[in-house]
């Protein structure tokens, strides 16, 4: 419990104190966000706001997790688990991809960045490496960081993604991992369009996963082989990472809340999407994450619906996509949209945890 708290506290402090340093530096260098001409008119005043604040978020996550690991080594002698390293590596890899995208935007002075092909290749390579590694490193109980089964609250034993011959099964599994990583990283990226929206929603999701992973740690099959135990590798490390993500997002939100002094950029949004994806896979809650992170799902779905509708019928379903811009164009104030989306995110997160806990109660009663 101490390590989980320390991870969040350190991440918050690093993020909240590093972010203003970045604001001053980027402002002095004239490195500010460009705003799309086709975007909401109210956003034009944000032109020039420093971006790449995701650097502070990433720094918070890294230092928060590493300090918590160090505390564990000193107090209990327990070293870090491989699951934590793999999810952290995924987060940093996507953060690096986002950094490259942000850097190109700032150098060119246009709201463009890496082309779609470059992003696709970057996410694909990252997903393949992550997918291959999570099936390695079995612990003393034979548990690996990931499995080839689709999961809801835990693995669904009857739904193995890697069906067929070994090579075919592995290809299917890697495609699935790519879709999970690409979907969540792009969904968080699309949500990052209003002051405090993505950082606030991600904080809510991370807070929920602190509870989920802590409960998995307390009821791990490695500790007590009870009926409802969780066959998750390194749940304490995953809880520390979720806590670090929560703390880093809250520290950044202090400066990113309306009116935002800095944006996280793709550096932050792609990294946080990677953290969400990594936690969903390693905690065996891939389908549950859809409920917990429903705001991200709605934001991404609104873009897909808009594009498909326009190409098929020539008509738009929404005034503008992602959907948060639709409500802005209907006359909602930006802060109203953000707060209402936070409320919906909190309700979804509570519902998700309720489903998770109810499943445990049902299993523990037998």
Curated annotation (Swiss-Prot):
One Gene Ontology cellular component annotation held by this UniProt entry: plasma membrane
InterPro entries (alphabetical): Glycosyl_transferase_4, PNAcMuramoyl-5peptid_Trfase, PNAcMuramoyl-5peptid_Trfase_CS
Annotated pathway: Cell wall biogenesis; peptidoglycan biosynthesis
Top-level taxon of the source organism: Bacteria
One Gene Ontology molecular-function label: UDP-N-acetylmuramoyl-L-alanyl-D-glutamyl-meso-2,6-diaminopimelyl-D-alanyl-D-alanine:undecaprenyl-phosphate transferase activity
Single biological process term from Gene Ontology: regulation of cell shape
Residue ranges crossing the lipid bilayer per the database entry: 3-23, 54-74, 80-100, 120-140, 161-181, 197-217, 238-258, 262-282, 288-308, 341-361
Cofactor(s) it depends on: Mg(2+)
CDD domains: GT_MraY
The enzyme's E.C. designation: 2.7.8.13
Catalytic activity: UDP-N-acetyl-alpha-D-muramoyl-L-alanyl-gamma-D-glutamyl-meso-2,6-diaminopimeloyl-D-alanyl-D-alanine + di-trans,octa-cis-undecaprenyl phosphate = di-trans,octa-cis-undecaprenyl diphospho-N-acetyl-alpha-D-muramoyl-L-alanyl-D-glutamyl-meso-2,6-diaminopimeloyl-D-alanyl-D-alanine + UMP
Protein's cellular compartments: Cell membrane
Keywords tagged on the record: Cell cycle, Cell division, Cell membrane, Cell shape, Cell wall biogenesis/degradation, Magnesium, Membrane, Metal-binding, Peptidoglycan synthesis, Transferase, Transmembrane, Transmembrane helix
Pfam families: Glycos_transf_4, MraY_sig1
Membrane topology: Multi-pass membrane protein
Protein family: Belongs to the glycosyltransferase 4 family. MraY subfamily.
Role of this protein: Catalyzes the initial step of the lipid cycle reactions in the biosynthesis of the cell wall peptidoglycan: transfers peptidoglycan precursor phospho-MurNAc-pentapeptide from UDP-MurNAc-pentapeptide onto the lipid carrier undecaprenyl phosphate, yielding undecaprenyl-pyrophosphoryl-MurNAc-pentapeptide, known as lipid I.
Protein name: Phospho-N-acetylmuramoyl-pentapeptide-transferase
């Amino acid at each position: 419990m101490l390590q989980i708290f320390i991870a969040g506290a350190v991440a918050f402090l690093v993020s909240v104190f590093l972010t203003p340093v970045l604001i001053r530096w980027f402002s002095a260098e004239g490195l500010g966000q460009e705003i799309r001409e086709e975007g909401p008119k109210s956003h034009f005043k944000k032109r020039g706001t420093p971006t790449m604040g995701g650097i502070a978020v990433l720094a918070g996550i890294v230092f928060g997790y590493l300090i918590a690991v160090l505390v564990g080594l000193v107090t209990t002698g327990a070293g870090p688990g491989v699951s934590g390293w793999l999810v952290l590596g995924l987060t940093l890899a996507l953060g690096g991809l986002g950094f490259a995208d942000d850097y190109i935007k700032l150098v060119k002075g246009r709201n463009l960045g890496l082309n779609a092909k470059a992003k696709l290749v970057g996410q694909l390579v990252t997903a393949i490496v992550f997918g291959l590694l999570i099936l390695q490193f079995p612990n003393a109980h034979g548990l690996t960081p990931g499995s080839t089964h689709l999961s809801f609250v835990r693995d669904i034993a009857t739904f193995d993604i890697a069906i067929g011959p070994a090579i075919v099964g592995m290809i299917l599994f890697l495609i699935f991992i790519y879709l999970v990583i690409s979907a969540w990283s792009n969904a968080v990226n699309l949500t990052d369009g209003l002051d405090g929206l993505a950082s606030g929603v991600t904080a809510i999701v991370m807070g929920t996963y602190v509870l989920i992973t802590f409960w998995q740690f307390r009821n791990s099959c490695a500790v007590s082989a009870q009926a409802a135990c969780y066959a998750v590798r390194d749940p304490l490390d995953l809880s520390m990472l979720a806590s670090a993500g929560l703390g880093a997002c809250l520290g950044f939100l202090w400066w990113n809340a309306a009116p935002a002094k800095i944006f996280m950029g793709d550096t932050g949004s792609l990294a946080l999407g990677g953290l969400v994806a990594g936690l969903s896979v390693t905690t065996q809650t891939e389908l549950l994450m859809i409920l917990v992170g429903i705001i991200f799902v709605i934001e991404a779905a609104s873009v897909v619906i808009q594009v498909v509708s326009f190409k098929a019928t020539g008509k738009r379903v929404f005034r503008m996509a992602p959907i948060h811009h639709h409500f802005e164009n209907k006359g909602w104030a930006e802060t109203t949209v953000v707060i209402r989306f936070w409320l919906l995110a909190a309700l979804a997160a509570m519902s998700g945890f309720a489903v998770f806990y109810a499943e445990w109660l049902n299993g523990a009663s037998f």
